[in-house]
Amino acid sequence: MNKFSVSGVNDGLVSPMHSFLEALMSDNTIPKTVERVALNIRSKDINSRFQPIEIQLERTSSKTPWQLRFIATFDVMVAGKPQKELSLYFNFAGCWFYHPEIKQCSLQRPEVQTLLASWLKAITHTLITQPAISIKITSVH
């Protein structure tokens, strides 16, 4: 079982976030020497409207919990060739949030916490119900 540390979220989001991360990593064994990983979540269906997601986790040693660094989602623009544009960026390490229309603000803002809770609920539902989702875990150097 993996252990996680999540900062910058209200108490009501800690347990759902731990469950979400545990579910993503449950079928994967990560070597003890790896200190940072990226989880890339994509749809296998190229016609899907599913937004690609990148989640990064970091730890100082195999004996310490994984710390959630960030969650980023991307809009995919298709005009000849696929192109990704940052949509949502929850930076837990720095405790800030970014969206292209509102720019950067505190992760602690109530409306950002509400957005994160809604996003977490929606993505968890999608991962459970959509079989055409791939999760690739790679080490980051």
Predicted regions and their residues:
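Short N-terminal edge-element motif at the start of the domain
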Residues: 1-38
